[in-house]
């Protein structure tokens, strides 16, 4: 059973994402849990976890759309090898921004809307489609085994807003010995780009204070990335595993 947990106070977005996941998982037992009055993403996800019954938990933003059609099969395969998977993260977390350490530690594949109706496929980091040894993941989309979430919970006291809950959850998982991976064959469109503001900085400071002694040493560095602009009708073909691997090889 897959338990899909989404926090959203936007009815139109909530309706879309429910329909999207119901379609993706139509051939698999699943439940969709909407938290429409979350006080924070930590609090909302904790409530969703308490309501859930599945052995695989998915925590998703409300503004994503998968290009990959066989998401359930890929998740089942990845979670047979790892405990927590996502679409962006780092093998070296040096502060409250997962991209801070730069190349060769950061890995991602995410698609953003661009001008003229095109979309930009953004690939970060060379290597295989599925990268093990991850220390922290972005929270745009996360999937994990139930025992991970139950054993860790969510820190709604320190992260009582909508930022850094994801790094807190996934870095905590890493510190507890769970196996994390970035799986870039889970290609999705993310309708929004995060913009750090004063609230984000507040929670970044809280995160660094909480984990100061566990963060890796290092100075910020640039990431290596590849950007490809495509019309929507070409996305599925481009995001097939062999095609993606070929594109990512250009970063090597």
Q: PLM features: what roles do these ranges have?
A:
Residues 10-26:
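Short, well-formed alpha-helical segments that are part of the catalytic scaffolds
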Residues 38, 65, 69-110:
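Conserved donor NDP-sugar-binding/catalytic core segment of glycosyltransferases
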Residues 38-52:
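Glycine-rich, basic loop-to-helix element that forms the pyrophosphate-binding segment
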Residues 57:
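Short aromatic/hydrophobic "clamp" motif used to bind/position activated sugar donors
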Residues 136, 146, 150-171, 180-189:
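Donor nucleotide-sugar recognition loop
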Residues 181-201, 206:
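Active-site donor/metal-binding and catalytic loop motifs
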Residues 199-209, 223-252:
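Non-catalytic, C-terminal membrane-associated alpha-helical segments of glycosyltransferases
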């Amino acid at each position: 059973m897959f338990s899909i947990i989404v926090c959203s106070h936007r009815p139109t977005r909530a309706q879309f994402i429910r329909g999207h996941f119901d379609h993706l998982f139509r051939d698999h037992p699943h439940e969709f849990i909407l938290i429409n009055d979350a006080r924070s993403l930590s609090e909302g996800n904790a409530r969703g976890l308490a309501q859930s019954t599945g052995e695989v938990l998915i925590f998703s933003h409300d503004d994503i759309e998968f290009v990959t059609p066989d998401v359930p099969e890929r998740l089942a395969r990845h979670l047979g090898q790892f405990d927590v998977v996502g679409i962006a993260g780092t093998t070296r977390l040096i502060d409250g921004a997962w991209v801070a350490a730069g190349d060769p530690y950061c890995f991602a594949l995410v698609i953003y809307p661009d001008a003229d109706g095109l979309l930009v496929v953004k690939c970060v980091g060379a290597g295989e489609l599925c990268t093990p040894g991850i220390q922290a993941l972005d929270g745009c989309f996360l999937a994990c085994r139930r025992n991970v979430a139950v054993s860790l919970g969510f820190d709604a006291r320190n992260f009582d807003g909508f930022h850094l809950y994801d790094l807190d959850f996934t870095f905590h998982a890493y510190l507890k010995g769970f196996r994390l991976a970035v799986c870039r064959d889970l290609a999705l469109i993310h309708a929004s780009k995060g913009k750090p503001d004063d609230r984000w900085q507040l929670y970044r400071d809280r995160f660094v204070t909480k984990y100061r002694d566990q963060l890796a040493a290092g100075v910020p560095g640039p990431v290596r990335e590849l950007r490809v602009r495509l019309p929507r009708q070409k996305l599925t073909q481009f995001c097939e595993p062999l095609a993606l691997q070929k594109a990512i090889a250009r970063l090597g």
